[in-house]
Amino acid sequence: MTVAVGRPQSQRGAFDVLDDWLKRDRFVFVGWSGILLFPCAFLSIGGWLTGTTFVTSWYTHGLASSYLEGCNFLTVAISSPAYSMGHSLLFLWGPEAQWDFARWCQIGGLWSFTALHGAFALIGFCLRQIEIARLVGIRPYNAIAFTGPIAVFVSVFLMYPLGQSSWFFAPSFGVAGIFRFILFLQGFHNWTLNPFHMMGVAGILGGALLCAIHGATVENTLFQDGEAANTFRAFEPTQSEETYSMVTANRFWSQIFGIAFSNKRWLHFFMLFVPVTGLWMSSIGIVGLAFNLRAYDFVSQELRAADDPEFETFYTKNILLNEGIRAWMSPADQPHQNFMFPEEVLPRGNAL
């Protein structure tokens, strides 16, 4: 008698079928992260394009902000909601808009729509890098690096206005709108004298410097392994040998500075660490601003400058500039407060 022993075929459930379809090899990988990434990215980008093309900011900021009103690419924006909306999520079906799309746009609903979907899209993109790294079998350092931009976006567009009294104080989605927000941070928070801003600048500019030095050093030490006019065509993605000389690069920088990286892994980790740490530090600083934490205050210099007209430092000059920013920006930037400053109390520069 013959006995056939076999493994019973397991029943494939709907989850397994969906998992196979999401992870199928295609031109654009979808994956589980794509369920979050693609809809949110589509809606946030679509909301921004719609708002900058058609929607005015007259009802929220008293400004023109769309192509339809004559703005250009640098001046269009989706402005933050009206101050009276507080921290409402401004759903289209909520009590503020009540399914009225025109009213929803007027009170700033597109801003919250774009901000929230944009935040989830960035998180989805980070998860996408983790998912693909796991499938390919590599480390998830790309995703770790991308947490820096996510932290900046969430802290600036969500955490800061949450710490303030309304979404109104968030930056608008536009080039000139971001510039206005930067001036606001300086005038009302003295942001450039905040140590977390200093660490952020050091990280970003330091990362740019490291990137430039690394790229130039690699180009300088390429092996002459081709007969073409340039060395780019001599490289093959699948080649087993090195394409540049680490030993030569180490000797070069040892002569320049006296010290140099001798370990490629430490070098590239350092290039990852510097800019990402800078982004995270600036994000922490923005969260501090949300709760109105102050930057460095050199009160002794302010007191001496108040008593001695001949004593002035760059710090005291910057404090006066901040006062000027507040005085000039407040009436236009916060129309709901109905500020009215007499001409004689507004700061006047020598050139005015």
From Swiss-Prot:
GO terms for biological process: photosynthetic electron transport in photosystem II. Its main location: membrane. Pheophytin a binds at residues 129, 142. Coiled coil: none annotated. Chlorophyll a ChlzD2 binds at residue 117. GO terms for molecular function: chlorophyll binding; electron transporter, transferring electrons within the cyclic electron transport pathway of photosynthesis activity; iron ion binding; oxygen evolving activity. Keywords: Chlorophyll, Chromophore, Electron transport, Iron, Magnesium, Membrane, Metal-binding, Oxidoreductase, Photosynthesis, Photosystem II, Thylakoid, Transmembrane, Transmembrane helix, Transport. It catalyses: 2 a plastoquinone + 4 hnu + 2 H2O = 2 a plastoquinol + O2. Chlorophyll a PD2 binds at residue 197. The chain crosses the membrane at residues 40-60, 124-140, 152-165, 207-227, 278-294. The keyword Ion transport does not apply. One of its GO terms (cellular component) is photosystem II. It is found in: Cellular thylakoid membrane. Pfam families: Photo_RC. Fe cation binds at residues 214, 268. The D1/D2 heterodimer binds P680, chlorophylls that are the primary electron donor of PSII, and subsequent electron acceptors. It shares a non-heme iron and each subunit binds pheophytin, quinone, additional chlorophylls, carotenoids and lipids. There is also a Cl(-1) ion associated with D1 and D2, which is required for oxygen evolution. The PSII complex binds additional chlorophylls, carotenoids and specific lipids. The keyword Transmembrane helix applies. Its EC number is 1.10.3.9. 2 of the reaction center chlorophylls (ChlD1 and ChlD2) are entirely coordinated by water. Photosystem II (PSII) is a light-driven water:plastoquinone oxidoreductase that uses light energy to abstract electrons from H(2)O, generating O(2) and a proton gradient subsequently used for ATP formation. It consists of a core antenna complex that captures photons, and an electron transfer chain that converts photonic excitation into a charge separation. The D1/D2 (PsbA/PsbD) reaction center heterodimer binds P680, the primary electron donor of PSII as well as several subsequent electron acceptors. D2 is needed for assembly of a stable PSII complex. HAMAP family: PSII_PsbD_D2. Belongs to the reaction center PufL/M/PsbA/D family. This is Photosystem II D2 protein. It comes from Trichodesmium erythraeum (strain IMS101).
